[in-house]
């Protein structure tokens, strides 16, 4: 059976890895998932990400999870726009996540950016997900 929403699967693997206090999680590789992982590294939510291969030889992304004082840095990671219901917002309508403490991942014509950067650039786009 094929995977319907690979980004939601990535978020779920990260959530499950944090719940199980894993150091690393592995996700099947795609360019958009690698962009999201790099975004999470730049925002400080995960330690690192790198392209690797599974034991079967399939490309994957190895994500090193981040903890602070034994607690996961990511409290919440949630998919917003999904294949069956895409959510687009203009720069004026972009939501503030956790009152500004979290970030919305926005896919714009300028690439993947945070809600703050999208507002600064004056561009809207598809809301991929929320992280806090």
UniProtKB/Swiss-Prot annotation:
**This protein's superkingdom?**
Bacteria
Q: List the taxonomic lineage.
A: Bacteria, Pseudomonadati, Pseudomonadota, Gammaproteobacteria, Thiotrichales
Gene Ontology molecular function terms on file: rRNA binding; structural constituent of ribosome
Gene3D superfamilies documented for this protein: 3.30.1370.30, 3.30.1490.10
Which gene is transcribed and translated to give this protein?
rpsH
BP GO terms, sorted: translation
The keyword Coiled coil is annotated on this UniProt entry: no
Cellular component GO terms held in the UniProt record: ribonucleoprotein complex; ribosome
Please name the InterPro entries in this protein's record: Ribosomal_uS8, Ribosomal_uS8_CS, Ribosomal_uS8_sf
What UniProt keywords are attached to this protein's entry?
Ribonucleoprotein, Ribosomal protein, RNA-binding, rRNA-binding
| NCBIfam families, per the entry | PRK00136.1
The entry's protein name is Small ribosomal subunit protein uS8
The similarity comment for this entry is: Belongs to the universal ribosomal protein uS8 family.
Q: Nucleotidyltransferase among the record's keywords?
A: no
Q: What assembly does the database describe for this protein?
A: Part of the 30S ribosomal subunit. Contacts proteins S5 and S12.
Q: What does this protein do?
A: One of the primary rRNA binding proteins, it binds directly to 16S rRNA central domain where it helps coordinate assembly of the platform of the 30S subunit.
Record's PROSITE patterns? RIBOSOMAL_S8
């Amino acid at each position: 059976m094929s995977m319907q929403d690979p980004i939601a699967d990535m978020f779920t693997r990260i959530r499950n890895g944090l719940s199980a206090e894993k150091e690393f999680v592995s996700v099947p590789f795609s360019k958009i998932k690698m962009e999201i992982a790099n975004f999470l590294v730049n925002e400080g939510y995960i330690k690192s990400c790198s392209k690797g291969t599974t034991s079967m030889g399939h490309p994957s992304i190895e994500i090193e999870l981040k903890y602070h004082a034994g607690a996961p840095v990511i409290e919440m990671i949630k998919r917003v726009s999904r294949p069956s219901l895409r959510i687009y917002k203009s720069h004026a309508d972009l939501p503030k996540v956790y009152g500004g403490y979290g970030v919305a991942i926005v896919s714009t014509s300028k690439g993947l950016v945070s809600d703050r950067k999208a507002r600064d650039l004056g561009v809207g786009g598809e809301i991929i997900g929320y992280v806090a």
